């Protein structure tokens, strides 16, 4: 209802689950009209539509061979991300030709063996292709993917990091740094300043 009250014609989403819920369930049920009051658009698709405006900002070469860990369920997202990556100077996009199933990693939770096989085969294909970088699309996937970075000869990032790099922007992936530690005490020690700044209970943080 809040989206509809803005009278906007387009609402952006990042998460494919949200995209499916809003565009296929919530928005169509809001009124009796054939058309929902607004269109839901995945952010990558929105950004690719504005590539002509973005391109002049991509000034720093990113000399990397990049493969994409992607899922086809959110229409147009993979194609949009490839277009965006291909616009980055110096970046070489590498197609791993992997099976395309689901809409993100969590959508394969009911098929754990297929999920693990897809992940393992993607990592091996990326290694065989001698990529420098495996880029994911969704943050939910990144939480799983980044934990494997130390086991492979390539970095694991979100595709937006590569766009930011070409724009001269960088922000450390603290989640990945902590995830790779694989040690609760080390994570607590490294994040002590943030725990204190946000008035968190260290034991609550440990449990989470």
For each predicted feature, which ranges?
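Iron-sulfur cluster-binding electron-transfer modules in prokaryotic oxidoreductases
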Residues: 1-208
């Amino acid at each position: 209802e809040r989206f509809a009250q803005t009278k906007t014609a387009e609402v952006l989403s990042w998460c494919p689950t949200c995209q499916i819920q809003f565009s296929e369930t919530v928005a169509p049920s809001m009124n009796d009209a054939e058309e929902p009051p607004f269109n839901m658009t995945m952010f990558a698709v929105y950004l690719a539509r504005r590539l002509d405006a973005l391109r002049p900002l991509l000034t720093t070469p990113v000399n990397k061979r990049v493969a994409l860990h992607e899922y086809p369920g959110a229409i147009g997202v993979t194609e949009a991300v490839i277009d965006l990556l291909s616009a980055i100077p110096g970046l070489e996009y590498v197609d791993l030709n992997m099976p395309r199933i689901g809409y993100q990693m969590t959508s394969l939770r009911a098929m754990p063996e297929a999920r693990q096989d897809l992940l393992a085969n993607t990592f091996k294909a990326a290694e065989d292709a001698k990529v420098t970088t495996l880029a994911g699309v969704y943050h939910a996937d990144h939480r799983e993917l980044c934990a494997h970075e130390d086991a492979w000869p390539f970095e694991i990032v979100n595709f937006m990091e590569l766009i930011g790099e070409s724009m001269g922007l960088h922000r450390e992936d603290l989640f990945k740094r902590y995830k790779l530690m694989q040690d609760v005490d080390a994570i607590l020690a490294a994040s002590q300043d943030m725990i204190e700044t946000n008035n968190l209970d260290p034991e609550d943080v440990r449990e989470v």
